[in-house]
Amino acid sequence: VNLAKEIDADLVMASDPDADRVGIACKDDKGEWVLINGNQTCMMYLYYILTQYKQLGKIKGNEFCVKTIVTTELIKKIADKNNIEMLDCYTGFKWIAREIRLSEGKKKYIGGGEESYGFLAEDFVRDKDAVSACCLIAEVAAWAKDNGKSLYQLLLDIYVEYGFSKEFTVNVVKPGKSGAEEIKAMMENFRANPPKELGGSKVILSKDYKTLKQTDDKGNVTAIDMPEPSNVLQYFTEDGSKVSVRPSGTEPKIKFYMEVQGEMG
């Protein structure tokens, strides 16, 4: 970012050492550099791809996108408004790759991603790929600039058209054997006593991916169509908020993914 300031760049892109994730930064409307999170990047990818597909007449009705269940629901809104199917899968790009494989010869995959900075456009790679992602975000930035906008202004346009979304994650660390037992007890308590309200808004749908059952606010129970059980709980509220809870698979912590939505004028 310091170098970007020196040369008055429009965009900063950085990948991790194995080049599967990419983070970006751009200037806001005051000229200050801001970091763009994984959800926001995925929004801009999808918005751009669908805009180009529509302009080129490439939407044939069999296209689909994929997101993980903890990724923002605003991405689904973008897909829905453009009549593109959006599939949900578990955290981890192997699940996105699975959906691509299952749809080979039937549907066309045109993009997908997860909130943890992993993205994939087209299907010639079957894992998150920072190289193609960097190429695509540079193309998005150039397209925005050709239309007299910055990436930041493009993001604001998306919020105005589809609604505002704010996401954040809280990690609660519980080390050792006692910590693992405490995390297990927390998940069991959430299952036994699911919240009725979150942030003052009524919970209208609870999903338990361990039992593969979902319950609405009227008590109706239906099945969740996923390939296997997973220790994840999700709560959706009347005002469009979403809270996802799951233990980490690699570290002694429990993770809370939170999303709130609203309107921008």
Residue ranges with predicted function:
Residues V1-R21:
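N-terminal small/polar loop signature for handling phosphorylated ligands or for N-terminal nucleophile
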Residues D20-G38:
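Short Gly/Thr/Asp-enriched flexible loops that form oxyanion-binding sites at enzyme active sites
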